[in-house]
Amino acid sequence: MLESEFQSQVIDLARLRGWMVMHQRPAQIRTGRWITAVQGDAGFPDLVLARAHHGDLIFAELKKEGGRISPLQKAWIRTLIGTGAEAYIWYPSDLPQIITRLSRSNP
């Protein structure tokens, strides 16, 4: 499964369960060169998911099966967890756990 397919699946699951979804879409500026219009430190997670009435906020980095996390992505996840935030690195094989997490309230 491509990362983009996995991402669409997670976004659809989140929306079906009442989550608001933030995803920064990159734009191709020339062949092989992509940028994101939003500024910030590199490696920020792919998705931010929120459900206000449940008090839920999740940061999720998505990878295709076998995909590698960059040092900057690891740093963001560690930093977010260090603040008490809920942050994950999710792979397609994590789908059962993702469904469970998106279906329940804040742990």
Region annotations inferred by a language model:
Residues 1-107:
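Catalytic phosphate/metal-binding cores of nucleic-acid and nucleotide-processing enzymes, i.e., regions
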